[in-house]
Regions:
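Beta-strand-rich binding-surface signature
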Residues: 1, 10, 45, 59-60, ...
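Beta-strand cores of modular interaction/reader domains in eukaryotic scaffold and signaling proteins
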Residues: 12, 49, 83, 138, ...
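RNase H-like nuclease module associated with reverse transcription
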Residues: 21, 58, 94-210
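Structured nucleic-acid-interacting core domains from mobile-element enzymes and related host factors
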Residues: 39-63, 129-131
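RNase H-like nuclease fold core
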Residues: 61-104
Length: 210
């Protein structure tokens, strides 16, 4: 757990999954934990590398959701990765607290979590050194982006209005910005589902892991 929260975002999803059964683990959970440990042993020298650039350090946050990814409960998984100086500084992978009835709903829930995180990080960075840039949240779902930017009320999203109103408010206030990102470059994808080796390595590079 310490490695997952401190230096290894690449195992965040795997650790999140096995942590769901802490109260009643079975043999399959033991197998999964051993697999994680073998992976860590084989990548023991992996760590986050930061490459600060003078006047060019941007706070970026990637938000993603795997709709209905938990086959036991039907709940979606939220993945968020925030980077600064080309390296991950904050991340989490967690199962959403209720069932999302659509991909858009799952993405909006994830975006609201990302917004809370990036607003907190912005204030933290501003306490350390003056930080005037507007941090950006990158989302690979166009409907979720439209909800964040559109001031009109949508009846079909009434059940999640608090979530998208929160994101929209922060966008309108200039606290955060939202951008579209292709699925290929959606870094948070690594925190919502199990990925094959080549794809995981690609996203690890984007998180500054090397």
């Amino acid at each position: 757990m310490y490695l997952m929260t401190g230096t290894r975002p690449d195992i965040a999803f795997a650790v999140s999954v096995v942590s769901r059964n802490l109260e009643n683990p079975d043999h399959s959970d033991v197998v999964k934990v051993k697999r994680i440990l073998r992976y860590l042993k084989g990548t023991i020298d992996t760590g986050i590398v930061y490459r600060p650039q003078q006047n060019q350090n941007t706070l970026l946050c990637y938000s993603d959701a795997d709709h209905g990814g938990d086959k036991t409960t039907g709940r979606s998984t939220t993945g968020v990765v925030c980077t600064y100086a080309e390296g991950a500084i904050s991340w989490f992978s967690k199962r959403q607290t209720s069932v999302a009835i659509s991909t858009t709903e799952a993405e909006v829930v994830a975006a609201s979590e990302a917004t809370r995180e990036v607003v907190w990080l912005k204030r933290l960075l501003n306490d350390i050194a003056r930080f005037d840039d507007i941090p950006v949240i990158r989302i690979d779902n166009e409907a979720a982006i439209r909800l964040a930017q559109n001031p009109e009320y949508h009846r079909r999203t009434k059940h999640i209005q608090i979530r998208h109103f929160f994101v929209r408010e922060k966008v309108a206030e200039g606290e955060v910005g939202v951008q579209s990102v292709t699925t290929e470059h959606q870094v948070a994808d690594a925190l919502t589902k199990a990925l094959l080796g080549p794809r995981l390595k690609q996203l690890m590079i984007q998180m500054g892991l090397g």
